[in-house]
Amino acid sequence: MQIISDKTEFKLKGVSAVAIGKFDGIHAGHYRLIDEILRQKKNGLQSVIFTFFPSATVYFGGEDAKELTTREEKREIFERMGIDVLVEFPLNPETAATDPVDFVKKILIEMMNMKFLAAGEDVSFGKGGKGNRVLLEEMAEENDFTVKIIEKIFDHGKEISSTYVREEILKGNMELASELLSR
């Protein structure tokens, strides 16, 4: 697996299927995103995970924001799953201020040769988190890429998310937390 870390300028060779997200505590929703891009390999697209480092949770949440999965653990999981490229894009004042349209055009399309994008229904990106699924769907038509929005997954009426996993860990419910993080 190729890892592109801490670079704001790069160019991927070939065309890409990209999954975008925080990927903290890789759970069922993340696995659905990853499965979508891995399926695109049969169409000749390389599988790419795009995430920010540090994550938006840590960057905007301050030092108290705790992640479930370390950078190294995420890398190991993605490698095991057969991901071709991992992009750990630096999140800093300059990149956080990127216009959402510019983010899609310059980073996802131009730098990553994206032809397919998988994202969660609550995806947000760009300045002020203004980029969302509606913008992606509009831009897909205009810019020759396909977007697949993955709906939320629920367990016992509760949305499966990194926050849910974190809550269960804090309650001491390690069995459920482990189940939520397993494939």
Where are these regions (language model features)?
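Nucleotidyltransferase catalytic core that binds NTPs
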Residues: 1-183
